[in-house]
Amino acid sequence: MFTAKNPFEDIVLKATSDELTSENWELNLEVCDKVSSGGDTAARNCIAAIQKRLVHRNANVQLYALTLADAVAKNCGLAAHQEIASRSFTQTLARICLDRNTHSTVKKRCSALVKEWAGEFDDQSLGLMKETYESLKSQDAVAEDETPAEPPREPTSEQLRAEDEELRRALELSIQDQGGRNAWPSYNTEQAETSGSSAPAAASSSSSAYQPTSQSLAPAQQQQQQQHDANHTNGTSSSAHAQPLSAATPPAVASRVRALYDFSPTEPGELAFSRGEVIRVLDSVYEHWWRGEVRGEAGIFPVNYVEVLPDPTPDELQREAQMEARIFSQAADIDRLLSKLRSLDPARDNLADDDELQELYQKSLAMRPKIVKLIDRYSNKITELKAMNDKFVHARGSFDEMMEQSLSRYNPGGHSSQDYLRPRPELQQHFSASSADYAQHPSYPTAHAYSVQQAQSASSAHDQIQYPFNPEQRHGYAQSAGAEPADPSYVQGSRLPSGPQPPQQITMAHQQQPHEQQYSSAPHDDEKRRLFERARAESEAFQQQHFQSQAHTSRSGYSGAYPSQPDASVLNQQMGNMNIGGSSSYASHPTGH
């Protein structure tokens, strides 16, 4: 009623386990020993256990079972051959070879063993194996014979001797040609610096310089060297032709990759990511490490942890946009489903019979994966935008701090940095137009007027010395009454007689250098421009009023001496009332002659 357990089942199970990485020949030989010592019954039990493993779904288990059957066939004699050639076992082999779900490697191995066993089993009682082979062959289930590759021929002694001779010559040439052919010109140059008179002859031609020791070589070696030179020249030219082609087609660098595994950084500067995240590639630093960014963090990551994502084509982008529009257009179906569910009562209404409800539910259910995909996409965009905003805030804070430090160092007491940090759309949108308008502003001299002013200043140098304006006074340093001018030419020129000077030229001479400084440092924003124009207008009005009255006094009482200078204290008081720049450029005490 109950059948006894097969004694070979456990050992065959171990020998064909799916946990093995290769054939366990120790167990295979142990099975063969048990079959040889057990007789016909042992052979029958062993082949039955192997037959169970042949129908396993794991391809590795099937391969291990076929290997074990082949070992039993080769080591256990006629009793094992009869069991292998039985109808039950041969039908199992044929089923493996003809099954479409069987792995191709298992099919090839099984058909090869059937062919091998059909040729080895020459006993009349084993004819079923030959019939199985013929049947499989008629159904094209047996792999065709592959012509074995010819084994490499053993080199003869003459070939070995010739190779040794060529190697010896190559070594001699390499010793003589140290640094390669391209190193000989530099070698000759170094010898030219040290040897003196022998250098010109050595450097007269590169061909003669390349063969300094060719005369000492044997004729065969000279011929070998010439062939080596020709081959090197051809190789250089071919590589030169091939170089533009390789440079024209640089390897493409991926722009996006997807993480295949979780990566936890072990060193500072590495990028951490989780499986499935899309990483934006910033640079391919090394062959196996790239630099990327994800969730606002940047760092390097191993290439074998990710897979390259191709850039989306215009068609794909269009399809995604259409799918997104379709999802938003179908959002009304979800609202209809919710409103309909609120109006139904499961206690009194049969929901299964409501076709409209079922249709709305199926439509909403089909939208679910698309909505999740859109959520993931927009979540990534939100993360990137937040990271971009954080970077901008950091950059803006750094810029504000550096601008404050720069203004406090190079422009103390000037305007605040807020004047520079205020956004100016007119400069961003109409930069070229505002620049042209600023250049043509009537309150600033044009290039032509400025050159005319320079020419007038140079031509009226003799008239300008009538008014003894000391440049040091312009910078706030008064000259003492008894001090002599340091420049002799200035003393000589100041004593030359001259006629009275017009007030316009006096004003121009007095303002020449300050105006140049003001023009060279013209402001570039509206507020500073208005302040500049106001200060300039007030300064011109004051100077015209003062110097006209002073010139009138000097013309009425002219006696050939210097005209009287204006009182510096009065000028400082008047300039302080106007509050131009917060300080005066005149001396704090009167000067004398």
From Swiss-Prot:
Membrane topology (UniProt): Peripheral membrane protein
Gene3D superfamilies linked to this entry: 1.20.5.1940, 1.25.40.90, SH3 Domains (2.30.30.40)
Superkingdom of the organism of origin: Eukaryota
Compartment(s) where it occurs, according to its Swiss-Prot or TrEMBL record: Endosome membrane
Disordered: annotated span: 136-251, 474-593
Listed Polar residues bias regions: 175-193, 232-241, 504-521, 566-593
GO molecular function, one term: phosphatidylinositol binding
Gene Ontology annotations of biological process type: protein transport to vacuole involved in ubiquitin-dependent protein catabolic process via the multivesicular body sorting pathway
Cellular component terms (Gene Ontology): endosome membrane; ESCRT-0 complex
UIM domain location: 162-181
Boundaries of every VHS domain copy: 15-144
Residues annotated as domain SH3: 252-311
Assembly: Component of the ESCRT-0 complex composed of HSE1 and VPS27.
Chain's role: Component of the ESCRT-0 complex which is the sorting receptor for ubiquitinated cargo proteins at the multivesicular body (MVB).
Family: Belongs to the STAM family.
Protein name, as recorded: Class E vacuolar protein-sorting machinery protein HSE1
